[in-house]
């Protein structure tokens, strides 16, 4: 909250959109999830929220979750609290569109396979070979690849993503990567859409 106060965040009029991974990134897991109850806050679903959802019923997902910071979920929460949190996470969108000052911004946690936002939005969750919803939470290909198949994403002014830690905020085409390692180096990036 101190970072929001530093930048002059207006809790009455501004909206903070998180790019997922509200949990498993430090010791304030519950406090971060509680932000979902605030009118000024929303988030897309990240792979760590997905691990909570999957880990309830799938031992392999649970093991993966535990080895990636999720032990608190199984050790500190009652089964009822786990279920309530999972229900909150199921409500989080895989992708979110925000209109601001005549521009359209897209938010996903990890990756967008398509170079067209509208195609991505229509096909989210339906793919013969690569599930766009899973890629949106787990993928890194657009950032970690010099593959020429990934270009400017049409139909949206900017796509904002997290998931892959970069030393500083990074832009490729109209995609912004803003995970600067808050979990590792306490460097929290807040991107003001006025500057995009």
Question: Model-found features: residue ranges?
Answer:
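Active-site neighborhood of divalent metal-dependent phosphoester bond hydrolases
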Residues: 29-98, 102-103, 125-139
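N-terminal active-site segment of His-dependent metallophosphoesterases
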Residues: 1-34
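Conserved beta-sheet core of the metallophosphoesterase superfamily
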Residues: 139-196
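Short, well-ordered beta-strand micro-motif
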Residues: 97-99, 107-109, 190-194
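Divalent-metal (often Zn2+) His-rich catalytic cores of metallo-beta-lactamase-fold enzymes
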Residues: 104-127
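Short, solvent-exposed loop/turn segments at secondary-structure junctions
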Residues: 24, 49-50, 111-114, 165-167, ...
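Active-site neighborhood of phospho(di)ester-bond hydrolases with catalytic His/Asp-centered motifs
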Residues: 16-20, 43-46, 107-108, 157-164, ...
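Catalytic phosphate/metal-binding cores of nucleic-acid and nucleotide-processing enzymes, i.e., regions
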Residues: 10, 16, 60-61, 77-80, ...
């Amino acid at each position: 909250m101190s970072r929001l106060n530093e930048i002059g965040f207006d809790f009455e009029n501004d909206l903070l959109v998180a790019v997922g991974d509200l949990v498993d990134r430090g010791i304030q897991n519950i406090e971060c999830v509680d932000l979902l109850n605030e009118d000024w806050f929303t988030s897309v679903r990240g792979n760590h929220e997905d691990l909570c959802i999957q880990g309830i019923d799938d031992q392999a997902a649970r093991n993966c979750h535990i080895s990636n910071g999720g032990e608190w979920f199984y050790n500190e929460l009652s089964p009822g609290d786990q279920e309530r949190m999972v229900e909150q996470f199921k409500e989080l969108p895989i992708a979110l569109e925000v209109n601001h000052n005549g521009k359209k911004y897209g938010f996903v946690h990890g990756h967008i396979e398509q170079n067209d936002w509208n195609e991505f939005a229509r096909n989210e969750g339906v793919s013969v070979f690569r599930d766009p919803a899973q890629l949106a939470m787990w993928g890194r290909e657009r950032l970690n690849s010099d593959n020429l198949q990934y270009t400017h994403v049409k139909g949206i002014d900017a796509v904002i993503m997290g998931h892959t830690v970069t030393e500083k905020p990074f832009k490729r085409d109209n995609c912004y990567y803003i995970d600067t390692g808050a979990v590792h180096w306490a460097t929290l990036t807040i991107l003001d859409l006025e500057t995009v």
